[in-house]
Amino acid sequence: MSVTGLPFDDFRTLLRDLPGPDPRALVAARERDAQLTKPPGALGRLEEIAFWLAAWTGRAPAVTRPLVAIFAGNHGVTKQGITPFPPSVTQQMVENFAAGGAAINQICVTYDLGLKVFDLALDYPTGDITEEPALSERDCAATMAFGMEAIAGGTDLLCIGEMGIGNTTIAAAIHYALYGGTAAEWVGPGTGSEGEMLKRKIAAVEKAAALHREHLSDPLEVLRRLGGREIAAMAGAILAARMERIPVIIDGYVATAAASILKAANPSALDHCLIGHVSAEPGHLKAIDKLGKTPLLALGMRLGEGTGAALAAGIVKAAAACHSGMATFESAGVTNKH
């Protein structure tokens, strides 16, 4: 990062000049697809996914080093009584990931996906967004930079997920700030908020948006004031993947909040991304619609942990395998249409 200027300056520069897809690789993928032993378009979105992989990786579609990156953070807003679980559960779940006992571990084993877990100062929750900014600009920028390291070990498909007690409140606040409407439209039960607790959750989002209202026209200010460390790190990871032309699968409502920040900063910022699934959290489909995306899966899930993105990675791997492994009409001796 630069040693001059404001902490966000480097990210504003990156967001202004994002690399695009490789048109030659896309053309080559389309030409091969036209020769495969199937009617045109018969594989539906699998074909679109293969083209997307080719365009962003600049090669024939292949997934050889898929990675799930989970970012874990804690939030000061939990003291407002908006969740039935204490913040200590975040650390406990990080330990569960390390021990191989979480749902995401089983999915990664099933689909042969790598897994990295990044815990982000769990003993130091962010500021309570109903009272103060979640992060300083310096801390937010540093956390984004930390998130960029998710791709350091090498990957050709990055799945973005998270863990953090209270972070569906944070996601709701971000989407409310970016897209308007009412707070109630964006707030859902998360890990089980209902009744009076759900009312407190809505009130917290309303209070936070009102407190920071004068600063919410800037997406990066939305991130630092209403976000959290895992949101900032996910935004950094998605951005780093773009700079290296690595395709990304985004998980649920909270991961989508990080994506929404980037989309607000540059309308093309998510062109290298797919939405893995639509979760049961009520605001998620609305947020996906705002991004102009279509999720790959709709399984009624609302766990987080990158689980929906990881399941979608199995579909992406299948798309690449079909594209590369299927015979052509000529090689199989199958008659093509006239």
From Swiss-Prot:
GO terms for biological process: cobalamin biosynthetic process. The keyword Ubl conjugation does not apply. The keyword Ribosomal protein does not apply. Keywords: Cobalamin biosynthesis, Glycosyltransferase, Transferase. It is an enzyme of class 2 (transferase). The active site is at residue 305. Gene3D superfamilies: 1.10.1610.10, 3.40.50.10210. Its EC number is 2.4.2.21. Belongs to the CobT family. Catalyzes the synthesis of alpha-ribazole-5'-phosphate from nicotinate mononucleotide (NAMN) and 5,6-dimethylbenzimidazole (DMB). HAMAP family: CobT. This is Nicotinate-nucleotide--dimethylbenzimidazole phosphoribosyltransferase.
